[in-house]
Regions:
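Anion-binding alpha/beta catalytic cores of soluble intermediary-metabolism enzymes, centered on
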Residues: 1-169, 174-246
Length: 246
C-alpha cells in the first residue's frame, strides 16, 4: 500500500498529485475538498501539468436515466463555455473513445440545438453541418452523427415521427453534444434532480482520467465516476491513439 501524503496547502497538494501521476505512481486523479481552480491550475501547467500540447480540456458525463432505454453520454456541462468547431470535433472524439470503453461499437451522436433548422443566427448550427459532413466522409470512423436535433427528437422516436424528421438518430442517441455550457449544465442538473438519474463524469484531455465531482454529487455518483475512470484506464490503447495519433 502506498504511503499517505499529507499536504495542507491546496496548491501544493494539487501539484504533488499531478507529479505522482506524471511519474507513473497513479493512473487516476480525483479532486477532493480543494477548490476546482487549484486542481485545474496544476493540470494545465505547461511545464509540469497533465494536458498534452494541442489537446483540449473538456468534460464528458454519462447518465443512467430511468425513463431512457440505455446509457446517455453528454458534453460539455462543465468546462468550455462556447466550443469552437475544432473543440466540438475533439469533444466528439473523446465521447466516441469512451463509448467504445463501454462496449458501444457504433455510437450515435446527436448535435443538440433548440430546433432541427440550421440558421446563421446560431453559429453552432453551422458547425453542426460541417461535423455531419466530416462524419459522412468517414472522418470519425464507425459512428453515426446527425444534427441539429433537439433533445426530445434525439431521445424519443415518436417525437421525430410526429415532426416528420428523418434521422438515423431519432430516439436512439448514445451521445448528446450541447451547443454551450449553459444548456449542457442545465440538462445535467435537471435530469439528475427531476429524473433521479445515476451519473458519472470525467475531465477529458489529460494523460489520465480526472474525476472532478461537484460539491452536490452523491457518494454513489463519485463511485460511478471512479468506475468510469477505471474503464478508461483499461481502454488505454484507445486513449493513447486519441492523444498521440491525432
Amino acid at each position: 500500500m502506498s504511503k499517505p501524503v499529507d499536504i495542507e496547502d491546496s496548491d501544493e497538494a494539487a501539484r504533488e498529485a499531478v507529479r505522482i501521476v506524471r511519474e507513473g505512481g497513479a493512473d487516476i486523479l480525483m479532486k477532493g475538498i480543494i477548490n476546482t481552480d487549484n486542481l485545474l491550475h496544476a493540470i494545465l501547467d505547461k511545464e509540469k501539468g497533465l494536458l498534452p500540447k494541442g489537446k483540449i480540456l473538456t468534460h464528458l458525463a454519462v447518465m443512467e436515466i430511468p425513463t431512457y432505454h440505455k446509457l446517455l453520454f453528454f458534453s460539455d456541462a462543465a468546462v468550455i463555455p462556447r466550443p469552437t468547431l475544432q473543440q466540438r470535433i475533439e469533444m466528439i472524439w473523446y465521447a466516441i473513445c469512451t463509448c467504445r470503453h463501454f462496449g458501444i461499437e457504433q455510437p450515435r451522436v446527436a448535435l443538440i440545438h433548440c430546433t432541427e433548422k440550421v440558421s446563421a443566427k446560431f453559429p453552432h448550427s453551422l458547425d453542426y453541418v460541417n461535423i455531419v459532413e466530416l462524419a459522412e466522409a468517414g472522418e470519425f470512423g464507425n459512428v453515426i452523427i446527425d444534427g441539429p436535433l433537439d433533445v426530445r427528437t434525439a431521445c424519443e422516436q415518436a417525437s421525430g415521427d410526429i415532426k416528420g424528421i428523418v434521422s438515423p438518430i431519432n430516439g436512439q442517441a448514445d451521445v448528446l453534444i450541447f451547443p454551450n455550457i449553459e444548456s449542457g449544465n442545465a440538462f445535467y442538473k435537471s435530469v439528475s434532480l427531476f429524473a433521479n438519474a445515476d451519473m458519472a463524469g470525467l475531465l477529458q484531455g489529460p494523460i489520465c482520467p480526472v474525476v472532478l465531482p461537484s460539491r452536490s454529487d452523491s457518494g454513489l455518483s463519485k463511485y460511478y465516476s471512479i468506475a468510469m475512470a477505471c474503464l478508461q484506464v483499461a481502454g488505454c490503447e484507445c486513449r493513447e491513439k486519441l492523444n498521440l495519433n491525432r
